[in-house]
A protein has these predicted regions:
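Short, basic/aromatic recognition patches
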Residues: 8-23
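Feature of Fe-S/electron-transfer and energy-metabolism proteins
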Residues: 1, 5, 9, 120, ...
Length: 143
């Protein structure tokens, strides 16, 4: 992991983002903090909908906020999750979120910080959580 990335700070930001989650159905709240290459942090939370399909994950919320503001280069993401009235549990991104990361992040090295607390976390790369990922390079496109 890049030494300029402070996992504890990102986890604290993700914990704050989680407080904004809208989860009247699952009561499972997720927060994400996405670090850009130039040091900005974009927060995201999960937002549920009665139809479930239109719901959005915390990770995608953070990415879409950042991309909608012109960001295209990302250094890391921290994710925290757990039941509304319970402890945080180690939770990896869903498949759709992994695919969004594949679009914008370095497949080999992008660090994904899965947090339980600022001092208790696991770091994995995008390649580790999405083996044999399909991305722009599979289409002979260099972004």
């Amino acid at each position: 992991m890049n030494m300029n990335i402070d996992a504890e700070v990102l986890i604290k930001e993700a914990i704050e983002a989680r407080k904004m989650a809208y989860t009247p159905y699952s009561h499972f709240k997720v927060g994400a903090a996405l670090l850009t290459a130039d040091g900005k942090i974009y927060r995201g939370c999960n937002i549920e909908n009665a139809g479930y399909t239109p719901s959005n994950c915390a990770e995608r919320t953070a990415f879409f906020k950042a991309v909608s503001e012109g960001e295209r280069s990302f250094a890391a993401i921290a994710i925290v999750a757990g039941p509304e009235n319970g402890d945080l549990v180690l939770t990896a991104p869903c498949g759709v979120c992994r695919q969004v990361m594949m679009e914008f992040c370095d497949y080999e090295t992008f660090p994904i910080i899965l947090g339980i607390s600022p001092n208790d976390y696991k770091i994995m790369t995008l390649k580790e959580i999405l083996p044999l990922g399909f991305g722009p390079k599979n289409l002979n496109i260099e972004l």
